[in-house]
Structure formats: C-alpha cells, structure tokens
Amino acid sequence: MIEIVVIGAGFAGACAAWTLRDQIDCQITILEQSAEPGGMLRTLRTGDGLPYEYGPRVVSVFRGTHDIIPFLQRFVGLEERQVYQGTRLLPEYPVIPFPVDLESVRALPCGRRIERELTAIREAQTPPRETNLRDYLESSVGPTLTELAFEGFNRKFWGRRLEDMPAEWGKLRRLERVSESGLFRLPSRAPHYYPSGGFNPLFERMLVGFDVRTGTRVTGVRKERRGIEVVTDAGVIAADLVIATAPVDALLEYEFGPLEWRGYRIELDVVEDDAGPGLGTAPDGVPFAWLYTPWLGTPVCRTTDFGVIHQGPGRSGPAVLLREIVDEGVPMYPVWWEDRRFYKYLARAARIPGLVPLGRLGLYKYVTMDSTLAMVQRLAESLESYLGSDAGQRLEILRSVRGDWQT
C-alpha cells in the first residue's frame, strides 16, 4: 500500500485524492490549512446568508476534458445556466455583449469607425500579424477596438502594455472574435452549469472516507532515505508520495525568488429582485451574468451578478453583486513572463523523489475545473512511471502533466 499525502483540499487536491484512491491501493491523508476544504471553489455567504463565489462561478468544458460533467454528476446535480458576458467600453457607453458583435458595435458612438476597420481587415484577407499582442489585435479587430476593449484592461490587470505581451496571449483567449450578431457566451461553446446547492456539497461528498486534517499548515517537504516527509505545524508525516497543490515557490522556500501573480480583491453589494437586471441584458433579453469594465479610469475589472448565476432567469429575492478590483497580493493568475523562474522550481521539485506539484498553485498554470481534471488524469496515467524514474525523467513527466496553455 502506498502512503500518500495531499497538500491542499481545493479541487485539484480533492480530485487527485479521489482519482488515486479509485485506481490504486493507497492510504491518503489530506492536509488543508483553512478551516474548511474547497479552496477558491467554495461557495461563501454574506452576513445575511446570500451566496457568492470568489473563484470559479460556473462549470463548463473550456479547454480541458469533457469527462468533467459526468465526474461532477457523481457528487452533485448540475443546473444549466445561460451565462452571457457583457462589456462597457467607456463609462458613457451602453453595455454590449462580449465578445463584441457588429450588430451591437454599430450602436456605439465609434461604431462606424470600428466597422470600417473590420471591413478593411476582412477585405485584405491576410492572416493576423503576430509580432506581439498589439500587432495581433490591431490586425484582427482594428485599432479602435484594440484600444477600447483591450489596451486599458491589460495595463490595469496584467500591468503590461499590449506590445510587451505575446500574440499567443490573444490567440489562447480567442480575442479576435467579432461575429455579425449574437455570440454572447463565454469562450466555451459547451453548456454552462451551476451545482445544485453551490460548490460546497461537492467537497463534502468527494472527501467522504478520507483523513482530512483542516487547520494544518505545511512548512516544508524533505527527502528522507525511505521516502519523503511533510513538515507541518502539527508534526512530521512520512509518505511515499506527496501531491502538493500549495504554491510551488513557497513549498520550496523561495529558492529562486517568489513567482509573480495577478489577482483581485472583491467588493460586495446586494441588489433586490425588483431592481431589474443588475448588469443589463443582451439583445435577446437574457441578463448578463458578468460585465467587464476595461478602461483605466476604474479599478474594477469585472462585476458579477450572482442572481443570474445562482437562480437563472426566474430569479427572486436579493442577490450579491460582486466587483473584482486588481490586487497583486492575491495569487490567482500566473503570468507568462515568469516561465523561466517557474521551470527552475519544477526542476527542483523533480529532484525530490515522490514529490508531485499539481494544480494552479503547484504547476503555476491558469486552470478551470475541466483542465484540472485533465491534469489529474494525466498524473494518474503516468504515476507508475514517475515513481520509478530519475530526476530528468520526472521533470519531463511533470511537464506533460502540466500540459500547455491550451490543455
């Protein structure tokens, strides 16, 4: 029997624990520094009991595995939602769907200019340029939309000018999309769901039968002759395998310096059910679930109406309106310019037999639930090889488990 310690009881840790217990003979201990499992995926509540989420808000197949839907349905019911997103390009402009469409753009004061630029691009029939992100956007959606929809947001959230970012950043997010009308959804073309009762029941059911030790802080890991030890504020735990979803730089004592992140803090308001759609509606009458505000003059990047997400079109009663404000102290989104530092950490982790960094924090990768499950599946498939490999082979396996930005 393999003794496994999982550091972190968020979705990556819980998913890995459940998957490995289902496939191999093992004893698993899960360590979580918070008082409850769930990590960024927990459903939180205001003082008056109204629910909201800090992290992911819906479930879909974005760019990971389609197995995510049946996997989650083992534990919770999934209620389909129409998730539309909008943008207000300037304070005085109306809200329009995002990704933008020509029908909505025409109603803007600058609509004719945007349409002329898009027409010229399409008539030229040349592929977008890829020198940098500005070049890519201006050659695919035109200078005006580039400035209004992307320039301010990138400076505000990522802290970088468009010309300092790679074209791949836009290609990954499909920022070039401008339809004639009606593409109101998220980058996922698959249906979107919200779990019945929120996300917390998912963890309550996934973690049944596990030794979950909440309120336990991990201070380090170290290689020993017979395996690996996890050092905590409650003592030392010996293991054959440690799956660490904690920040990889902190776990390895910032040997190469701290990794840079982007994130946000939140502000909450409550809207009553008689106030109408909190963020406006799309042309087909569906209320927007969230709204981007890309101009530099506001610190707010995005606002979410949880009445739409939690209750659907038949909403009733008050709901939370949540604003996301840039805060670099919150480690949510990895940045591309830290790849070199991250791979130093990954190589360092590979030199510790039995240590597997995993998830958003462990593998320094932006993930969704479907891509997290895909990551766990790749780990499970390669675990036997990993345990029998040398440091160089383990590094290659970890790179494969992480995947690229598209998986």
Protein language model regions, located:
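N-terminal Rossmann-like FAD-binding beta1-loop-alpha1 element of flavoenzymes
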Residues: 2-30
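Conserved Rossmann-like nucleotide-cofactor binding loop
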Residues: 12, 36, 249
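Glycine-rich FAD pyrophosphate-binding loop
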Residues: 21-46
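Mid-domain catalytic core of redox enzymes
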Residues: 23, 219-337, 342-348
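Conserved flavin/dinucleotide-binding core of flavoenzymes
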Residues: 43-45, 99-100, 302-407
